[in-house]
């Protein structure tokens, strides 16, 4: 691949052992290195080498077992592409190695006249949905894909929304109308066609029944449909159908300033609250060169763990409800109310505080915050004991969950499973330990693990995680650092209020950053966190402007739903419901 490499990029990757192995196997001329703030090697290559390179990385000693993310970028309006190969569009592949505890990103440059790249679904099975989404959003063709169809948009949709020439506002479209004929067309387009998915309507001994579970079903946990192929009560196969909750979150980031996009992050996993803010603001802080104060880091950790408990309580109640236990959800919601009282007392809001800021938090901790938090810490441990005794030790629940919808660590990694669902298989990988961020390296806590990767382990593990979250929060209360809640940096947005009220320069900066937005230098950054449901990451592309050129949001729930057919083939329908309850997803996290 021909492109001049900057000395910075060459130096950034020269000593990396994986890059050296690639250079030794394929030749340095095949790759172009890019210097970024992503924290991993970034290499461009021609598409004819893609499959061979991916196979090499997957099969090497200490392999890259997981395709963590795959998506695209419309490069046509990007102003700052110095030292990068010519490209109208880019497809990127982020690979993760659990054994090496490191990532690598590969990029393929494409011309608008030839938007085609080979499918990698034969190398990494979870590439299937990612490639469908890239085709849906950008119109890039993946040669050899088994079923390249719309994923998030309706089957009848025209255009590819993440292209730069596609409108970003509803006011740029004609007023929406739906005629009777149009409604019939849309309904017919949603009719499930088994043959299109390679399914048979009958076997030698039976006629299969096809059943829609959802998109409006209590156990679907949102607007979500699964088309089931059934032999009696046995699930022969199934096809998850997503997109009903798609809101264009990545597109909206292209018309919001770095600061004003924060409230949108709250609503990706709407049960995670400020946990969603964290990877975004950390990625922006990398671009801005902001080092957050120890106090701000600790406050962020404390509130993130509060929302982890809050989310896990919601999971526990609905998980048990899906198994037929109707009472527990009322107990867990009582505890969630107590958590919300703490959250509201500190941030001023409940579900969607949008409280983290570029450089810190919206304001400092209020007077009496420690007593408020301590009251919750004193309350919860005995409740977790009750949940375990009354529910997880219940013989009926154990019978319904043990060895049901089990999968191995290898299978989990192949499908991109992260978080508690991965750790339930016995895989000891938690970003808070393996790649500490926001000061997690200063906390003493354990990472709970399962053994069987089944429905029971996924439930028990989240109870154990709540205990560890309480342990972390207690350390925050006992050792909260003194100091500022915001960094003293020109790009901290908004600037500290005390300085804004006393210095005209800071007042001017405040006005510009809030009304127009901070200007960040061209570069790319990526931040990953251990969110409530798994690993959540934001990959940001800055082009020297007040807003993001491209924002890629990788959520944990998306690959978890793609794995459903592999986990439940041969199971009974009630076991499918148990599995759905155990993987802990919300559709806003899937569809974005």
Curated annotation (Swiss-Prot):
Pfam families: Complex1_30kDa, Complex1_49kDa. Its EC number is 7.1.1.-. It is found in: Cell inner membrane. GO terms for cellular component: NADH dehydrogenase complex; plasma membrane. Gene3D superfamilies: Cytochrome-c3 Hydrogenase, chain B (1.10.645.10), NADH:ubiquinone oxidoreductase, 30kDa subunit (3.30.460.80). Its main location: membrane. One of its GO terms (molecular function) is NADH dehydrogenase (ubiquinone) activity. It catalyses: a quinone + NADH + 5 H(+)(in) = a quinol + NAD(+) + 4 H(+)(out). Keywords: Cell inner membrane, Cell membrane, Membrane, Multifunctional enzyme, NAD, Quinone, Translocase, Transport, Ubiquinone. Residues 207-592 are annotated as: NADH dehydrogenase I subunit D. It comes from the Bacteria. Residues 1-183 are annotated as: NADH dehydrogenase I subunit C. InterPro entries: NADH_DH_suC, NADH_DH_suCD, NADH_Q_OxRdtase_suD, NADH_quin_OxRdtase_su_C/D-like, NADH_UbQ_OxRdtase_30kDa_su, NADH_UbQ_OxRdtase_49kDa_CS, NDH1_su_D/H, NiFe-Hase_large. Disulfide bonds: none annotated. NCBIfam families: NuoC_fam, NuoD, PRK06075.1, PRK11742.1. In the N-terminal section; belongs to the complex I 30 kDa subunit family. NDH-1 shuttles electrons from NADH, via FMN and iron-sulfur (Fe-S) centers, to quinones in the respiratory chain. The immediate electron acceptor for the enzyme in this species is believed to be ubiquinone. Couples the redox reaction to proton translocation (for every two electrons transferred, four hydrogen ions are translocated across the cytoplasmic membrane), and thus conserves the redox energy in a proton gradient. NDH-1 is composed of 13 different subunits. Subunits NuoB, CD, E, F, and G constitute the peripheral sector of the complex. PANTHER family: NADH-QUINONE OXIDOREDUCTASE SUBUNIT C_D, NADH-UBIQUINONE OXIDOREDUCTASE 49 KDA SUBUNIT. This is NADH-quinone oxidoreductase subunit C/D. It comes from Chromohalobacter salexigens (strain ATCC BAA-138 / DSM 3043 / CIP 106854 / NCIMB 13768 / 1H11). The lineage of its organism: Bacteria, Pseudomonadati, Pseudomonadota, Gammaproteobacteria, Oceanospirillales. The gene is nuoC.
């Amino acid at each position: 691949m021909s492109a001049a490499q900057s000395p910075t990029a060459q130096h950034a990757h020269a000593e990396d052992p994986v890059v050296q192995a690639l250079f030794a196997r394929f030749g340095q001329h095949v790759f172009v290195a890019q210097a970024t703030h992503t924290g991993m090697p970034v290499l461009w290559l021609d598409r004819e080498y893609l499959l061979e390179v991916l196979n090499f990385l997957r099969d090497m000693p200490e392999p890259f077992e997981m395709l963590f993310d795959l998506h695209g970028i419309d490069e046509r309006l990007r102003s700052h592409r110095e030292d990068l190969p010519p490209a109208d569009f880019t497809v990127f592949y982020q690979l993760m190695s659990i054994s090496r505890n490191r990532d690598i990103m590969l990029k393929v440059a494409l011309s608008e006249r030839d938007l085609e790249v080979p499918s990698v679904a034969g190398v990494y099975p979870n590439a299937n949905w990612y490639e469908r989404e890239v085709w849906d959003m950008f119109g890039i063709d993946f040669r050899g894909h088994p079923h390249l169809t719309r994923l998030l948009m309706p089957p009848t949709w025209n255009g590819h929304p993440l292209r730069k020439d596609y409108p970003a506002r509803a006011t740029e479209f004609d007023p929406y109308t739906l005629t009777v004929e149009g409604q019939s067309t849309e309904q017919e387009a949603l009719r499930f066609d088994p043959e299109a998915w390679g399914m048979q309507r009958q076997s030698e001994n039976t006629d299969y029944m096809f059943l829609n579970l959802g998109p409006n079903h209590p156990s679907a946990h949102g607007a979500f449909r699964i088309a089931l192929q059934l032999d009696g009560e046995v699930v022969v196969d199934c096809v998850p159908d997503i997109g009903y909750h798609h809101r264009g979150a990545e597109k909206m980031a292209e018309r919001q300033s770095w600061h004003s996009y924060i409230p949108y992050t709250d609503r990706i996993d709407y049960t995670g609250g400020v946990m969603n803010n964290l990877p975004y603001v950390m990625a922006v802080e990398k671009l801005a060169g902001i080092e957050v104060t120890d106090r701000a880091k600790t406050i962020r950790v404390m509130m993130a763990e509060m929302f982890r408990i809050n989310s896990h309580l919601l999971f526990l109640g609905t998980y048990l409800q899906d198994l037929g236990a109707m009472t527990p959800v009322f107990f867990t919601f009582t505890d969630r109310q107590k958590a919300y009282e703490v959250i509201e007392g500190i941030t001023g809001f409940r579900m969607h505080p949008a409280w983290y800021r570029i450089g810190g938090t919206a304001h400092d901790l209020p007077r009496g915050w420690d007593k408020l938090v301590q009251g919750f810490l004193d309350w919860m441990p005995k409740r977790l004991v009750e949940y375990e005794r009354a529910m997880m030790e219940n013989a009926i629940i154990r019978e319904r969950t043990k060895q049901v919808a089990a999968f191995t660590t290898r299978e989990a990694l192949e499908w991109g499973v992260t978080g508690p669902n991965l750790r339930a298989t016995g895989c000891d990988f938690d970003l808070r330990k393996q790649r500490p961020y926001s000061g997690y390296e200063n906390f003493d806590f354990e990472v709970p693990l399962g053994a069987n990767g089944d429905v029971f382990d996924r439930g028990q593990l989240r109870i154990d995680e709540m205990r560890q979250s309480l342990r972390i929060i207690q350390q925050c209360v006992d050792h909260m650092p003194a100091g500022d809640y915001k960094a003293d940096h020109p790009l901290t947005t908004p600037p500290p209020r005390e300085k804004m009220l006393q210095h005209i320069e800071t007042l001017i900066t405040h006005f510009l950053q809030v009304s127009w937005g901070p200007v960040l230098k061209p570069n790319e950054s990526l931040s990953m966190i251990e969110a409530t449901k798994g690993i959540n990451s934001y990959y940001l592309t800055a082009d020297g402007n007040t807003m993001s050129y491209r924002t890629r949001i990788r959520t944990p729930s998306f690959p978890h739903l793609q794995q459903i057919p592999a986990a439940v083939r041969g199971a009974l329908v009630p076991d499918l419901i148990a599995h759905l309850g155990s993987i802990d997803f919300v559709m806003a996290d899937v569809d974005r």
